[in-house]
C-alpha cells in the first residue's frame, strides 16, 4: 500500500503570473519570440513560482543511491561494490555532480536509500530499510512495505531542503544495475518491448544490451506485468529504492509548489512513475536534457516533454540537469533584467 499523501493533489501554476510574464516578454527590447526557449522557460517558472521575478539561484541537488539485486545477472559493466565506492566519491567532492554542484553553488545532499553499505559513509544521509533490492529475475525486487518506505524516504529528503528555500530542485541517482531496473519499469509502464528501451548503461556492448533485454523480458513475464498492471505492483516487482524515492520526492516537491528539473533516463522513468501515480504533479516537472540512453526518447514522448539540451550525456547523477541549470538562470536573468521598449526609449514594432 502506498502512503496516502502520494495521491494528494498538487496546486496548479499561477495563470495570472503566466499572463504577466508573457506580457512582459512582449515589451522587452527584442522581437517577440527571438529568445526562443529561453522565453518559454522564464514564463513557465514565473507561473510555477507565482512571481514576477522568476529565478533558479537556489537549486539544491539531492542524489539518491541504491543497489540492485539484478546486478548479479551481469547486466552492468561494473561490479556492485562501485555504488558504495561512489558514495564516498560524492561525499568527497570528486564525482561529476559534486564538481558541478560546487561550481553552480548548489547544495548537494547524498542519500543512501538502499545501497549495500553496512556502515555509515561520512557525509551521506542513511535512510534505508534494506541493503539492496532482491534479484528481480528470481523474486520481487521489493515488498509493498519497502516501496512505501522508499516513497517516504524521498519525501523526507525533499523536506530537508526547505532551509534552502528552493526555487527549483534537482534529483539524481546512483546504483549499479539501475538502468536495468529503469528499463524494466519503463517497458511495463509503456507496454514497450525491452529491446526498444535498453541502452548501454555503464558501457555495455551489443551482446550486453541483448542480454539485459532478455533478462527484462523474462522478468516481466515472471511477474505478470501486463499493460494493465498497477504502478505500485510494477515498482515492487522490478523497481529500485532510489528510483522510487525520486518518484516520491517529485510528488512531494510538486505538493510544496517546488518545480523539479528532471535529469536523464533513470530520473525520467521516476518522473513517469510519479505522473502515473499522481497526474497533477506533471506540470511541476521541467526536463533538462535528452540522454544518449536509447529508451529516454520514448519516456520523454510519453511525458510530452521537450528537454532543453542534447549533449549525448548518459552519466546520470543529475549531471545533465546541473549542466542545463545555467541556461535556466540566464533565461530568468534576461526576463528580469532586460529593458522594455518604453524604458529604453526604443521604438516598438508598431511605432
From Swiss-Prot:
A Pfam family cross-referenced in the UniProt record is DBI_PRT
Could you say which enzyme class this protein belongs to? transferase
Q: In which pathway does it act?
A: Nucleoside biosynthesis; alpha-ribazole biosynthesis; alpha-ribazole from 5,6-dimethylbenzimidazole: step 1/2
Gene Ontology MF: a single term? nicotinate-nucleotide-dimethylbenzimidazole phosphoribosyltransferase activity
Q: Which UniProt keywords apply?
A: Cobalamin biosynthesis, Glycosyltransferase, Transferase
Gene Ontology BP annotations: cobalamin biosynthetic process
Q: Any idea of its EC number? A: 2.4.2.21
Q: Which catalysed reactions does the entry list for this protein?
A: 5,6-dimethylbenzimidazole + nicotinate beta-D-ribonucleotide = alpha-ribazole 5'-phosphate + nicotinate + H(+)
**Could you tell me which SUPFAM superfamilies the record lists for this protein?**
Nicotinate mononucleotide:5,6-dimethylbenzimidazole phosphoribosyltransferase (CobT)
Q: Where is the active site?
A: 317 (proton acceptor)
Recorded family membership: Belongs to the CobT family.
| PANTHER family recorded | NICOTINATE-NUCLEOTIDE--DIMETHYLBENZIMIDAZOLE PHOSPHORIBOSYLTRANSFERASE
Q: What does this protein do?
A: Catalyzes the synthesis of alpha-ribazole-5'-phosphate from nicotinate mononucleotide (NAMN) and 5,6-dimethylbenzimidazole (DMB).
- Protein name in the entry: Nicotinate-nucleotide--dimethylbenzimidazole phosphoribosyltransferase
**Gene that specifies this protein:** cobT
Amino acid at each position: 500500500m502506498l502512503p496516502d499523501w502520494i495521491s494528494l493533489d498538487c496546486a496548479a501554476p499561477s495563470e495570472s503570473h503566466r499572463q504577466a510574464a508573457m506580457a512582459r516578454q512582449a515589451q522587452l527590447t527584442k522581437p517577440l519570440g527571438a529568445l526562443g526557449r529561453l522565453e518559454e522557460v522564464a514564463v513557465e517558472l514565473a507561473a510555477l513560482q507565482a512571481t514576477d521575478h522568476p529565478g533558479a539561484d537556489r537549486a539544491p541537488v539531492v542524489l539518491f543511491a541504491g543497489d540492485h539485486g539484478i546486478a548479479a545477472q551481469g547486466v552492468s559493466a561494473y561490479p556492485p561494490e562501485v555504488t558504495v565506492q561512489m558514495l564516498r566519491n560524492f561525499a568527497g567532492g570528486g564525482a561529476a555532480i559534486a564538481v558541478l554542484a560546487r561550481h553552480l553553488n548548489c547544495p548537494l545532499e547524498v542519500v543512501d536509500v538502499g545501497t549495500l553499505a553496512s556502515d555509515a559513509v561520512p557525509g551521506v544521509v542513511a535512510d534505508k530499510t534494506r541493503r539492496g533490492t532482491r534479484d528481480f529475475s528470481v523474486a520481487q525486487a521489493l515488498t509493498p512495505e519497502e516501496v512505501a518506505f522508499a516513497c517516504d524516504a524521498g519525501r523526507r529528503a525533499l523536506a530537508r531542503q526547505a532551509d534552502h528555500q528552493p526555487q527549483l530542485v534537482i534529483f539524481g541517482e546512483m546504483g549499479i544495475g539501475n538502468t536495468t531496473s529503469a528499463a524494466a519499469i519503463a517497458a511495463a509502464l509503456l507496454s514497450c518491448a525491452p529491446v526498444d528501451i535498453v541502452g548501454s548503461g555503464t558501457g555495455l556492448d551489443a551482446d550486453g544490451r541483448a542480454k539485459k533485454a532478455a533478462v527484462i523480458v523474462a522478468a516481466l513475464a515472471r511477474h505478470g506485468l501486463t499493460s494493465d498492471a498497477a504502478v505500485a505492483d510494477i515498482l515492487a516487482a522490478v523497481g529500485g529504492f532510489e528510483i522510487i524515492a525520486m518518484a516520491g520526492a517529485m510528488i512531494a516537491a510538486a505538493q510544496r509548489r517546488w518545480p523539479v528539473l528532471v535529469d536523464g533516463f533513470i530520473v525520467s522513468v521516476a518522473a513517469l512513475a510519479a505522473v502515473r501515480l499522481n497526474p497533477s504533479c506533471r506540470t511541476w516537472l521541467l526536463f533538462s536534457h535528452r540522454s544518449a540512453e536509447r529508451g529516454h526518447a520514448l519516456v520523454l514522448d510519453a511525458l510530452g516533454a521537450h528537454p532543453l539540451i542534447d549533449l549525448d550525456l548518459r552519466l546520470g547523477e543529475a549531471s545533465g540537469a546541473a549542466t542545463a541549470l545555467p541556461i535556466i538562470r540566464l533565461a530568468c536573468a534576461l526576463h528580469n533584467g532586460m529593458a522594455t521598449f518604453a524604458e529604453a526609449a526604443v521604438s516598438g514594432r508598431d511605432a
